Amino acid sequence: IWYLFRDNLLPRNTKFIGYARTKQTLAEVKEKCKKYIKVRTGEEDKLEEFWAANDYLSGSYDKRVDYEFLNQVISKYEKGPIANRIFYLAVPPTVFEDATLNIRNACTSIKGFTRVIIEKPFGRDDKSSDILSKDLAGLFKEEQIYRIDHYLG
């Protein structure tokens, strides 16, 4: 995401909101990411712009109230007439169903599109993957779902 931001390949005013079970601050997330983000000389200000476009909150995957709070956090950044939302899911199969259901029920955009990006493989085997795919199809239209291979990224 840093490279896309750095190279101006994302829409202006894009915001990044991290959501996970881990209770931590954005400063802690930033510190943990330092060793993975390559910053060339002269890009320090751009990196600060990137971090200013980030937010983080922790919550459970199975409690709708946490997703309602996530929706409030997202909404505070949506100032214009159009506000698209993309959810990138890199979650264990055990929480996939709860996470997608709560996104659908509490975090769908009312001012633009909602997309869900899912890292494959998801599920423990073909059978569980098929079950998760059917659940997903009941929550989102096919054009809202993007599947990517974790290893090919």
Swiss-Prot record:
Pathway: Carbohydrate degradation; pentose phosphate pathway; D-ribulose 5-phosphate from D-glucose 6-phosphate (oxidative stage): step 1/3. GO terms for molecular function: glucose-6-phosphate dehydrogenase activity; NADP binding. It catalyses: D-glucose 6-phosphate + NADP(+) = 6-phospho-D-glucono-1,5-lactone + NADPH + H(+). One of its GO terms (biological process) is glucose metabolic process. It holds the Pfam family G6PD_N. Its main location: cytoplasm. InterPro entries: G6P_DH (IPR001282), G6P_DH_NAD-bd (IPR022674), NAD(P)-bd_dom_sf (IPR036291). Keywords: Carbohydrate metabolism, Cytoplasm, Glucose metabolism, NADP, Oxidoreductase. It is found in: Cytoplasm, Cytosol. Its EC number is 1.1.1.49. Signal peptide: none annotated. GO terms for cellular component: cytosol. Coiled coil: none annotated. D-glucose 6-phosphate binds at K120. NADP(+) binds at R21, K120. It comes from the Eukaryota. It is an enzyme of class 1 (oxidoreductase). PANTHER family: GLUCOSE-6-PHOSPHATE 1-DEHYDROGENASE, GLUCOSE-6-PHOSPHATE 1-DEHYDROGENASE G6PD. Belongs to the glucose-6-phosphate dehydrogenase family. Cytosolic glucose-6-phosphate dehydrogenase that catalyzes the first and rate-limiting step of the oxidative branch within the pentose phosphate pathway/shunt, an alternative route to glycolysis for the dissimilation of carbohydrates and a major source of reducing power and metabolic intermediates for fatty acid and nucleic acid biosynthetic processes. This is Glucose-6-phosphate 1-dehydrogenase. It comes from Hyalophora cecropia (Cecropia moth).
